[in-house]
Design a protein with these regions (language model features):
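Beta-propeller folds
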Residues: 1-224
């Protein structure tokens, strides 16, 4: 009988995929409570995540959004996005790594630095691209009432009216020369407190509270 044992090196113990097997990520209920959605790796590529659903009534699991439907090819990540994924411990993940429910039949998906609004219904999901910029849109959310999609771009907070598509900057513009940004979670919040957002909607969609981050007194230490 051939020897099927494998030597487990330290590199393999901490590499992807996990030896304990795949686990669902980003588990959420839909607003109407009829579905449980989660991110799941593909059988042929566990690092590439698609959005799946569990129908509460029937108990059936099915693929909801194929990541390649939104973006067939992987985009080059920005340095800020790479750092954020490291802090979230998803540095090796591809495809859909985050999403936000809007209404019971709409989902906001950030992918490749842009935002997509996916409408669910009979047949294939309908995709509407909300942004198409060279900059990365991060920390995307749908407002509590479902009227706006909000996000951070280049250190400033923005919102898109989903009815007419108008985009508005909600905060002052960032001042990179002074190391000042708005609506972002600074390094300590992300790394030590596991807080990855820097802004919060009021329940009625009328107000947004956001952080002003001043890192001008933080020393720059080269990372080797």
């Amino acid at each position: 009988m051939p020897d099927s044992t494998t030597v487990l090196t330290p590199e393999r113990l901490y590499a992807s995929p996990s030896l304990s097997g795949p686990a669902p990520r980003g588990v959420k209920f839909s607003p109407d409570g009829k579905r449980v959605t989660f991110l799941k790796g593909r059988p042929d590529d566990q690092d590439r995540l698609d959005l799946w659903q569990f129908d509460v009534q029937t108990g059936i699991q099915s693929l909801l959004i194929n990541s390649q439907l939104l973006q067939p090819h992987d985009a080059e990540l920005s340095e800020a996005e790479k750092a954020l994924r490291e802090r979230k411990r998803i540095a090796g993940a591809k495809g859909i790594v985050d999403y936000s429910w809007g209404t019971a039949d709409t989902i906001l998906v950030p992918l490749g630095g842009d935002l997509y609004l996916v409408s669910l219904g009979e047949g294939e999901p309908q995709v509407r691209q909300l942004t198409d910029t060279d900059a990365f849109e991060t920390d995307a959310k749908v407002s509590p009432k479902g009227r706006y999609a909000s996000f951070v771009r280049e250190g400033a907070l923005y919102a898109i009216d989903l009815e007419n598509g108008n985009e508005t900057r909600l905060s002052p513009a960032a001042e990179p020369d002074k190391a000042i940004s708005y609506g972002v979670a600074e390094f300590v919040a992300q790394e030590e407190m596991h807080r990855f957002t820097g802004y919060w909607w009021s329940p009625d969609d009328h107000y947004v509270a956001y952080t002003r981050v001043d890192e001008s007194t933080v020393d720059i230490i080269p990372r080797f």
